[in-house]
């Protein structure tokens, strides 16, 4: 792994961008917990912000945490992933989780074709990424 010099003068290993993406998604999920808390404690305030489905806020919050953590783990457990795995995994993890936010604001959006197409594309991306991760790990096993 490449080394970078940090401000203190020590050398530290460069962090894989996929790991950074996963950790950022995980942190975003942690922060969305505040919004979910608002949904649970002050429904009127949440509604005034445009939230129509608290259940979808919960799904958004949990998916960001789960997929962010799994993405960070993936980039750590199997370093130097090929681009055909790295990009679909990183993009799919974000788009899968983020697809719940529009549903929180407009539950009927799931009936619209553009939304459905986007969700299918996201599932394809995530499926390619996680399957590619498993295949890459199996090939490197030994």
Regions found by a protein language model. Name each.
Residues 88, 111-121:
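Non-cytosolic membrane-interface motifs at loop->transmembrane helix junctions
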Residues 66-73, 125-133:
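Hydrophobic cores of alpha-helical transmembrane segments in multi-pass inner/ER membrane proteins
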Residues 27-28, 32, 54-77, 91-98:
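Core segments of alpha-helical transmembrane spans in multipass integral membrane proteins
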Residues 4-20, 74-87, 133-142:
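Helix-coil boundary and interhelical linker segments in multi-pass alpha-helical membrane proteins
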Residues 34-60:
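Interfacial loop at the N-terminal end of multi-pass membrane proteins
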Residues 22-26, 85-96, 122-125:
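Hydrophobic alpha-helical transmembrane segments of polytopic
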Residues 14-40:
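N-terminal signal-anchor transmembrane alpha helix
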Residues 96-110:
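Transmembrane alpha-helical segments of integral membrane proteins
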């Amino acid at each position: 792994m490449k080394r970078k010099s940090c401000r203190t003068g020590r050398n530290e290993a460069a962090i894989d961008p996929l790991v950074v993406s996963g950790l950022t998604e995980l942190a975003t999920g942690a922060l969305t917990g505040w919004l979910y808390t608002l949904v649970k404690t002050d429904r009127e305030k949440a509604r005034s912000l445009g939230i129509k489905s608290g259940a979808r806020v919960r799904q958004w919050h949990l998916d960001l945490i789960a997929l962010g953590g799994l993405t960070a783990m993936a980039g750590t457990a199997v370093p130097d992933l090929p681009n055909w795995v790295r990009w679909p995994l990183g993009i799919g993890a974000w788009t899968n989780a983020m697809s719940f936010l529009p549903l929180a604001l407009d539950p009927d959006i799931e009936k619209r074709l553009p939304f459905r197409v986007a969700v299918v594309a996201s599932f394809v991306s995530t499926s390619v990424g996680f399957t590619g991760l498993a295949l890459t790990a199996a090939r490197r096993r030994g």
